[in-house]
């Protein structure tokens, strides 16, 4: 949606193929709705640059289009002295990435902000927030269609052939057709590998391996025990147990 919106606003003729019967029913709606600050990514990496700049653009967009969001801040918590060095490393990395609002907190300061958290210290990220991802997607869809972009639901790309002028897409669903295009953007999430494999002539060595990382989501009934997003020190590829809050 974001890519299609941007292309349509730039004056391109855009058709967005959606395999499902509605937008955002897969990975776009299965996340914590967090606007990240850009702390965790290696310095000067593409992810770090995009996250820091994207955060600013997303807050700006939400303000302009009345998309519900909130800068509630995030605590990265050290629960033992042995984790202090990791917290300091994250602080240096975040600062190097351009996250200029990070603050180190001692145990008493953490307790004052979050009475239900026991910690040795924490790193406080003021610019981390949450967004209503469903409302954001609907806003993107509105922008796309207002710019004469077309959203085609129940329209899987069953196969793609490379042509002299671009690509020919075999679109399935209830109204199958062939669509010719000069530009094809593969933004299919977990279906990315399968989509690339369906492009005739696409070299297999350029297709990345899909590795699943399972996540479990739980809903806590009643009032929240936290006032901010709270994250433990990350361990290898695991962010451990984190909390997110509903927008107030």
Task: For the regions a language model picked out, list residue spans one by one.
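Glycine-rich FAD pyrophosphate-binding loop
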Residues: 8-30
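Flavin-dependent oxidoreductases
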Residues: 160-248
């Amino acid at each position: 949606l974001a890519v299609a919106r941007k292309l349509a606003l730039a004056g391109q003729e855009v058709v967005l193929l959606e395999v499902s019967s509605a937008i955002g029913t897969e990975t776009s709606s299965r996340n914590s709705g967090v606007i990240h600050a850009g702390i965790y990514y290696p310095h000067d990496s593409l992810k770090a640059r995009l996250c820091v700049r994207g955060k600013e653009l997303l807050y700006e967009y939400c303000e302009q289009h009345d998309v519900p969001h909130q800068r509630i801040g995030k605590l990265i918590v050290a629960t033992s002295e042995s984790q202090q060095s990791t917290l300091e490393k994250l602080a240096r990395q975040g600062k190097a990435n351009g996250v200029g609002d990070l603050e180190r907190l001692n145990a008493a300061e953490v307790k004052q902000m979050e009475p239900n958290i026991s910690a040795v210290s924490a790193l406080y990220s003021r610019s981390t927030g949450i967004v209503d991802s469903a409302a954001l997607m609907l806003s993107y869809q509105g922008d796309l269609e207002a710019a004469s972009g077309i959203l085609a639901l129940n329209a899987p790309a069953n196969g793609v052939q490379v042509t002299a002028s671009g690509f020919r897409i075999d679109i399935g669903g209830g109204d199958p057709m062939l669509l010719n295009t000069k530009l094809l953007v593969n933004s299919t999430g977990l279906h990315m590998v399968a989509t690339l494999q369906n492009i005739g002539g696409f070299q297999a060595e350029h297709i990345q391996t899909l590795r699943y990382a399972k996540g479990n989501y739980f809903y806590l009934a009643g009032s929240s025990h936290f006032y901010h997003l709270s994250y433990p020190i990350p361990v290898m590829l695991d962010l451990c147990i984190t909390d997110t809050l509903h927008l107030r």
